[in-house]
């Protein structure tokens, strides 16, 4: 494949753009080539003119800073480089290729098998445990932000734009996240910490098994009302083939009382996660 337009600083063309592989609210994601090393990367280029308020600008600053805080972890997309100009910010990251997001897989094929879900759950929790150890709270765990490397079924968490750094014992406030996956304490305006990520992860995993989220509504307001009611159900028609151990695990994460909700480390010790991989099936 031919790579043409160049990106670089100080008249040094460090990267060549090969193709666009994604597009979002603030810009594009491209596959780029670094001639000096022969490596390929994913480049998220953000158009600063598209940032409409202080929250957008904070997200712009957050992602590279938070990703740089985290040492290498196999289940987190790694940052490689940054090019900041007056008009754009380009974040160069590990290229996960070929890959598919959990969201795209749900749209194309529906539910996941339970062994597969348990294996992916373990990797998601390992990534969150690593983040929380460094004080990083993602705050937007959702299927779109979880990639699967199709070469080896490795899960990679990405997009830290909504994230925040919290010191030990610190909490924060503010409604951040995506309607189906946001924790109830966030919606209530309470102070919160890292356990919001565990709620979101639980909702993602429920959705992988059921093909639909546990709290549904036609509008954001209806979804928020369902989340705040917190009536977690496992309809027999949908969950007939899902183990009681898996349902117990989900109850530990999708727990309205954050003080009783599992941390990432506690979740990793749950029997359902401990047994993950015993009958694992390949991701297709």
UniProtKB/Swiss-Prot annotation:
<dbReference type="InterPro" id="IPR008271">
    <property type="entry name" value="Ser/Thr_kinase_AS"/>
</dbReference>
<dbReference type="GO" id="GO:0005524">
    <property type="term" value="F:ATP binding"/>
</dbReference>
<keyword id="KW-0670">Pyruvate</keyword>
<dbReference type="GO" id="GO:0009416">
    <property type="term" value="P:response to light stimulus"/>
</dbReference>
<keyword id="KW-0418">Kinase</keyword>
<comment type="function">
    <text>Calcium-independent kinase involved in light-dependent phosphoenolpyruvate carboxylase phosphorylation.</text>
</comment>
<feature type="binding site">
    <location>
        <begin position="21"/>
        <end position="29"/>
    </location>
    <ligand>
        <name>ATP</name>
    </ligand>
</feature>
<feature type="binding site">
    <location>
        <position position="44"/>
    </location>
    <ligand>
        <name>ATP</name>
    </ligand>
</feature>
<dbReference type="InterPro" id="IPR011009">
    <property type="entry name" value="Kinase-like_dom_sf"/>
</dbReference>
<feature type="active site" description="Proton acceptor">
    <location>
        <position position="140"/>
    </location>
</feature>
<keyword id="KW-0723">Serine/threonine-protein kinase</keyword>
<dbReference type="GO" id="GO:0106310">
    <property type="term" value="F:protein serine kinase activity"/>
</dbReference>
<comment type="similarity">
    <text>Belongs to the protein kinase superfamily. Ser/Thr protein kinase family.</text>
</comment>
<dbReference type="InterPro" id="IPR017441">
    <property type="entry name" value="Protein_kinase_ATP_BS"/>
</dbReference>
<dbReference type="GO" id="GO:0004674">
    <property type="term" value="F:protein serine/threonine kinase activity"/>
</dbReference>
<protein>
    <recommendedName>
        <fullName>Phosphoenolpyruvate carboxylase kinase 1</fullName>
        <ecNumber>2.7.11.1</ecNumber>
    </recommendedName>
</protein>
<dbReference type="InterPro" id="IPR050205">
    <property type="entry name" value="CDPK_Ser/Thr_kinases"/>
</dbReference>
<dbReference type="InterPro" id="IPR000719">
    <property type="entry name" value="Prot_kinase_dom"/>
</dbReference>
<dbReference type="Pfam" id="PF00069">
    <property type="entry name" value="Pkinase"/>
</dbReference>
<keyword id="KW-0067">ATP-binding</keyword>
<keyword id="KW-0808">Transferase</keyword>
<dbReference type="GO" id="GO:0046898">
    <property type="term" value="P:response to cycloheximide"/>
</dbReference>
<keyword id="KW-0547">Nucleotide-binding</keyword>
<feature type="domain" description="Protein kinase">
    <location>
        <begin position="15"/>
        <end position="273"/>
    </location>
</feature>
